[in-house]
Amino acid sequence: MRVALLMGGVSREREISLRSGERVKKALEKLGYEYTVFDVKEDFLKEVDQLKSFDVVFNVLHGTFGEDGTLQAILDFLGIRYTGSDAFSSMICFDKLATYRFLKDIVEIPDFIEIREFMETSPLGYPCVVKPRREGSSIGVFICESDEEFQHALKEDLPRYGSVIVQKYIPGREMTVSILETEKGFEVLPILELRPKRRFYDYVAKYTKGETEFILPAPLNPSEERLVKETALKAFVEAGCRGFGRVDGIFSNGRFYFLEINTVPGLTETSDLPASAKAGGIEFEELVEIILKSAFLKGEVRA
């Protein structure tokens, strides 16, 4: 099997993608797969036709282009098989506002509103969360407890993103649920609880060793564990996601509040999904092979 490994990309998550890609590359080598690495940059469309000579694309492009449905639509058009969710699901899940609107009657979501213009005060009160519609790795996310902090967040995000989501802040335990697809169906991995040393699970906390305490499995009683896993799987399936992914949320007062779905989650040495997989008895090389094989569960590919 010939594998095209796509890494790097043009988003603000490029460095994380390169780290994910390097780790996947070593795993593919150990597994004995024939592979070629593509460091995706601005001129990638000039070489995209080369992908037709491969059996499958292993996509570890995080953020815009690789995770927002753009790459997936191109590969669908060319009839090239790839890992992860399809173009529509990727597009929906990368846009948090679209995700919330799509899933609002299916799972519990903290109150939210879209803002396109500067405001003096939060329409949802404080504390609140300000975050971009389309971004990953907690880039551009602010927790605001005053008008001053709220205004600062808008001044940072609105010029860059054009619009932001303001969401009610739910105090509670941050949890992430990783999901794999195998020929037996969807497998929900052990729930990971995140206890960052910083104010919340931001970019630094995600990708710096020692900045976050990982609790695996999360200390939940059986009914709480069932609630979290069932909610995460319901969101994942209803959004049409495939292959592998991660669902993030807040567990508070016996309720699990959905926050987002990551359709191309990190695969670095500090990433959540590999940690959950290992807790479930799946070493990294096996995880890579499961993800790779899941690309062949999506039916016939037609150009």
Curated annotation (Swiss-Prot):
InterPro entries, per database record: ATP-grasp, ATP_grasp_subdomain_1, D-Ala_lig_Van_CS, D_ala_D_ala, Dala_Dala_lig_C, Dala_Dala_lig_N, PreATP-grasp_dom_sf
Coiled-coil ranges from the UniProt annotation: none
PROSITE patterns associated with the record: ATP_GRASP (PS50975), DALA_DALA_LIGASE_1 (PS00843), DALA_DALA_LIGASE_2 (PS00844)
Gene3D superfamilies referenced in this protein's UniProt entry, alphabetically: 3.40.50.20, ATP-grasp fold, A domain (3.30.1490.20), ATP-grasp fold, B domain (3.30.470.20)
Binding site for Mg(2+) 2: 260, 262
Protein name stated in the entry: D-alanine--D-alanine ligase
GO CC term, one of those recorded: cytoplasm
Name of the coding gene: ddl
Biochemical pathway: Cell wall biogenesis; peptidoglycan biosynthesis
Function, as annotated: Cell wall formation.
Keyword Ligase: yes
Family: Belongs to the D-alanine--D-alanine ligase family.
Top-level EC class: ligase
Superkingdom of origin organism: Bacteria
Catalysed reaction equations from the record: 2 D-alanine + ATP = D-alanyl-D-alanine + ADP + phosphate + H(+)
EC nos: 6.3.2.4
